[in-house]
Regions:
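Residue-level micro-sites within transmembrane alpha helices that shape
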Residues: 50, 98, 301-303
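Well-ordered mid-protein domain cores that form the structural environment of catalytic cofactors
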Residues: 71, 75-129
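Acidic active-site catalytic centers that drive phospho-/nucleotidyl reactions
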Residues: 51, 100, 195
Length: 399
């Protein structure tokens, strides 16, 4: 049975919908009100606070910590400075992705690693012969994401750290409400945003301090439904939705390489040995058989389907995590894995896994679309990702 996070007593007081979902053994708010509209608008137009404490978190230390990290991930951690954060993935020997997450370099041989799934056993299996300590600190460290255009100004008021000059994918230290915290300029919304890493038992104090300061910046608590829409707009993948971990895949077609899910840029074939390198070198030469791409669904086609049965077109209430077939010339060439109506773009969009020859931007495809339990096809055009990428996301300084 799930348990509450470090700030469950705070989120529960605000959760009018009483709508929760299980996330890594914790209760996570799906939506605070009866609809996530206000929460989404906070992410895109003001500031939103999201409890991301259920993330799996690890502390890597010891003389061989850097060597261990480089053995496991596809990027070269030796190029990463202390104070920097990277997004990365890690693979099995066949070059298929096990998980993705972020690594913060806290010291020369000290790292904080976040992941979607549990990885402790696999980490230990690949640390043999190394002087490295791997600690699961998931229930010692809470995390709050502050995301949105006013998030930087809010944190400038709430924290004693130099937030104004904190660069994208860097981290710093400070105090909020008298509590020592780490702050990284990272997030899962594709917008200006930060993640605050807090000692578990001190998290309610930080929540209260942010709420108090946030009154002047239109801060709202936001749940998973609003976050889902934002991350699709940002072109950010979700494990077990847009790809399957190779540890859980039952058949080969359920396994994905970094090149197949838009993470090819994270593969550094110039560095020393890492797990999966040989397989990825081969795929780099031949090219992946499928690619992650964006889809823009033709809304005129959707309207015509509703018109034909005498109904007004219906904008989907929530993002869909159900895979639906995508066709080209009557043949299935892939699937849309995450689909949503984008309130900011006023378009229906999707993340899709499409065969390489059909994934070029501007390709006209068809996507399955169901109206009143009847399946149809609507036109969909491939395009690059992300759909939404505001300059403020990476701008420095924050004013």
């Amino acid at each position: 049975m799930p348990v509450g996070t470090a700030v469950h007593e705070k989120t529960f007081q605000l959760c009018e919908s009483l709508s929760y979902r299980e996330w890594s053994g914790y209760y996570a708010v799906s939506v605070y009100e009866t609809h996530h509209e206000h929460e989404y608008n906070a992410i895109r137009n003001a500031a939103a606070m999201i409890d991301v404490s259920p993330l799996h978190k690890y502390r890597i230390s010891g003389k061989d910590a850097t060597k261990f990290v480089n053995r496991v991930i596809t990027r070269d951690i030796s190029k990463v400075a202390v104070g920097q954060v990277i997004y990365c993935c890690w693979c099995d020997e066949q070059g298929k992705v096990i998980d993705d997450g972020t690594i913060s370099r806290l010291g020369e041989n000290l790292y904080r690693w976040t992941a979607a799934d549990p990885n402790m056993r696999w980490f230990h299996q690949n640390a043999l012969g190394l002087d490295v300590t791997i600690e699961d600190i998931s229930n010692q460290l809470a995390a709050l994401a502050i995301q949105g255009p006013t998030s930087g100004r809010l944190l400038k008021q709430a924290c004693d750290a130099d937030i104004a000059n904190l660069k994208y994918f860097r981290h710093t230290h400070g105090r909020i409400g008298g509590v020592p915290v780490d702050i990284s300029r990272t997030g899962y919304t594709g917008d200006l945003g930060y993640e605050i890493w807090i000692p578990w038992n001190e998290a309610p104090k930080v929540w209260d301090a942010l709420v108090e300061r946030g009154r002047h910046f239109d801060l709202h608590a936001a749940g998973i439904l609003a976050l889902d829409v934002a991350r699709i707009e940002a072109g950010l993948i979700l494990i077990e939705v847009d790809y399957s971990s190779s540890k859980k895949a039952l058949i080969e077609s359920q396994k994905y390489s970094p090149y197949e899910i838009g993470l090819g840029r994270l593969v550094d074939l110039k560095k020393e040995y890492f797990i999966g390198r040989a397989a990825l070198e081969g795929e780099n030469r031949t090219g992946p058989r499928r690619l992650l791409t964006g889809l823009e669904i033709n809304w005129d086609d959707v309207e015509r389907l509703y018109d034909a049965i005498g109904l007004a077109p219906r904008v989907p209430d929530t993002a869909s995590r159900v895979a639906v077939p995508v066709y080209h010339g009557g043949l299935q060439v892939g699937k849309a894995t995450s689909t949503t109506w984008s309130p900011s773009l006023k378009k229906m969009i999707a993340l899709a896994s499409i065969s390489g020859e059909d994934a070029a931007p501007g390709t006209q495809l068809q996507m399955e679309f169901t109206v009143e339990a009847t399946r149809h096809k609507v036109r969909a055009t491939t395009r690059g990702l992300p759909f939404f990428n505001p300059p403020r996301k990476v701008a420095t300084p924050i004013v």
